């Protein structure tokens, strides 16, 4: 008789299976992301601006040294550029034969003489353009200075006017015009108080007045109805949008 259909209870119990004699030695599965990653404290390195290093450093001296190095690099680049340009111009001039060195037999009437003349013409044109630009720049600076001076004069004149007005208004012996204006205002107020005429509105004599109101809302009785279909709002809404 086969025993394959018998219930196997022993393998179903944890720690009692094959090779698992201890209940505490259960199988466990770990992931690499579950393991501790940072197991050591990271300290600040010597070149990472520690507080002691920052206190000991002389920032002004470092800044001055960097500025001197930058100026030296700029000057060296400018000198190299000028030397290269002068060498290139000398080489080009040495390569180009001068007009007096060319024999008359090689000169042709159709050949344009555009070597030195073009260079001198381009130099003169560039000088003229530079002079025109400088003149325009000076003109713009002068106009801006004049505009700034004009604004300052206007501001000073306005401040002086306000100061004189404050002085005159604060002194009752000098503020005669202000006293006259106050007296005139008081007289007008007394005249308006003495007159019993009611001022009319500017739209009292119009023909069509309050045409859109219809029935006076104040005369209607205010009532509350606990029904949405018979409420005043619903009636107004239906009259306005449905009819």
Curated annotation (Swiss-Prot):
Subunit: Identified in the spliceosome C complex. Component of the minor spliceosome, which splices U12-type introns.
Compartments, record wording: Nucleus
Gene Ontology BP term (one): mRNA splicing, via spliceosome
Biased composition (Low complexity): 84-94, 179-192
Full protein name: Protein CWC15 homolog
InterPro entries per UniProt: Cwf_Cwc_15
Coiled-coil spans in chain: 127-169
Acidic residues composition bias: residue spans: 108-130
Superkingdom of source: Eukaryota
Keyword list, A-Z: Coiled coil, mRNA processing, mRNA splicing, Nucleus, Spliceosome
Example GO molecular function: RNA binding
Residue stretches of biased makeup (Basic and acidic residues): 52-82, 136-159
GO cellular component terms listed in the entry, alphabetical order: catalytic step 2 spliceosome; nucleus; U2-type catalytic step 2 spliceosome
Source organism per UniProt: Danio rerio
Similarity-based family: Belongs to the CWC15 family.
Cited function: Involved in pre-mRNA splicing as component of the spliceosome.
Region called Disordered, residue ranges: 1-159, 176-196
């Amino acid at each position: 008789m086969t025993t394959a259909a018998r219930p196997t209870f022993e393998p179903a119990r944890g720690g009692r299976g094959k090779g698992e004699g201890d209940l505490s030695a259960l199988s466990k599965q770990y992931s690499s992301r579950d393991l501790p990653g940072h197991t050591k404290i990271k300290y600040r390195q010597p070149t990472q601006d520690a507080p002691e290093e920052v206190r000991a450093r002389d920032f002004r001296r470092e800044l001055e040294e960097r500025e001197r190095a930058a100026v030296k690099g700029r000057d060296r680049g400018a000198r190299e550029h000028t030397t290269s340009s002068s060498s290139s111009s000398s080489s080009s001039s040495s390569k180009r034969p001068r007009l007096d060195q060319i024999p008359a037999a090689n000169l042709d009437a159709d050949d344009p003489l555009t070597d030195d003349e073009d260079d001198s013409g381009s130099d003169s044109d560039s000088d003229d353009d530079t002079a025109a630009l400088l003149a325009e720049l000076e003109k713009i600076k002068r106009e801006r200075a004049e505009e700034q001076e004009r604004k300052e004069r206007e501001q000073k004149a306005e401040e002086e006017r306000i100061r004189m007005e404050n002085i005159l208004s604060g002194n009752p012996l000098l503020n005669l015009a202000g006293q006259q204006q106050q007296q005139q205002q008081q007289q007008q107020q007394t005249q308006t108080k003495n007159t019993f005429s009611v001022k009319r509105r500017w739209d009292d004599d119009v023909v069509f007045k309050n045409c859109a109101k219809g029935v006076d809302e104040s005369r209607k009785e205010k009532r509350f109805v606990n029904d949405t279909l018979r409420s005043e709002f619903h009636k107004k809404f239906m009259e306005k949008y449905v009819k």
